[in-house]
From Swiss-Prot:
GO terms for cellular component: plasma membrane. It catalyses: a nitrile + 2 H2O = a carboxylate + NH4(+); 3-cyano-L-alanine + 2 H2O = L-aspartate + NH4(+); L-asparagine = 3-cyano-L-alanine + H2O. The keyword Chaperone does not apply. One of its GO terms (biological process) is detoxification of nitrogen compound. The active site is at E69 (proton acceptor), K156 (proton donor), C190 (nucleophile). This is Bifunctional nitrilase/nitrile hydratase NIT4A. The keyword Membrane applies. InterPro entries: C-N_Hydrolase, C-N_Hydrolase_sf, Nitrilase/CN_hydratase_CS, Nitrilases_CHs. Induction: Not induced by abscisic acid or by 1-aminocyclopropane-1-carboxylic acid (ACC). Its main location: membrane. Expressed in roots, stems, cotyledons, leaves and flowers. It holds the Pfam family CN_hydrolase. It comes from Nicotiana tabacum. It is found in: Cell membrane.
Amino acid sequence: MALVPTPAVNEGPLFAEVDMGDNSSTPTVRATVVQASTIFYDTPATLVKAERLLAEAASYGAQLVVFPEAFIGGYPRGSTFGVSIGNRTAKGKEEFRKYHASAIDVPGPEVDRLAAMAGKYKVYLVMGVIERDGYTLYCTVLFFDSQGHFLGKHRKIMPTALERIIWGFGDGSTIPVYDTPLGKIGAAICWENRMPLLRTAMYAKGIEIYCAPTADSRDVWQASMTHIALEGGCFVLSANQFCRRKDYPPPPEYVFSGTEEDLTPDSIVCAGGSVIISPSGAVLAGPNYVGEALISADLDLGEIARAKFDFDVVGHYARPEVLSLIVRDHAVSPVSFTSTSSKAESSPK
């Protein structure tokens, strides 16, 4: 396989593709990961940007397009939301109000618009969003088919560190793997990908195209993505934002805690690193640390069977009589209401 660079698109991101040659005897899927920044606190403008990027990817023949974690709604990098042990500041509460206002309801008008985009450009779409459920927010991935249907969602089950003060915890009811004409598609978000039991649950559902929207641009992230591809015998598509300080509101409205004085408008605060990896652990496209980009590869689905001949983690390489996993895949609510179907009426005597 040879990495074939495509000339840069005017006023658009770099695009790269993998040439699979003419000898593949199995179906191929052209997949694109989007590396781009949210327009922070401006969800309508971010949706416009998402459509532009989706249209560009589709023009290159993409059948599946994966966006980064929290692309709609934004990843509040560097913010503390005014929190310390035993104290929340008024400024931090106002910051949360604005962040809450930038989130989207699922279902809701923004979901309908994303579905229409997927149908318009005839692509399967995996989109990272901040979901608003009343006054609780979730870091969520939405799935859409190429006919413009909303398939469902995955809520991040374990936010990391300070994310836990702004995002709720997903439960086992939203760990889907969708059987599509392109293959079986699912997603885990950022450091969820370091949770062996969650990965095992997805492998057990037969995942073939493993999407990993993230906010981690460190070099070590690539090792995790390669490991998952080898462990699961699946394609791994990791999409991250590429952000500069100027992509966030300026101070004092938005402050990168502890580092603001060291930043210029052009300082890189998230360097991307989006990548596509094959089931054999080969890097098909990326990682890109240069700027906003569309990163694409043609996925030879025959690679999955070839990889699983060596190692099938929930098949011939499993030992269920020694090691097994229980997944509670039902929704959990803090409040349950029960009532009788009818109330007996007493007759006056």
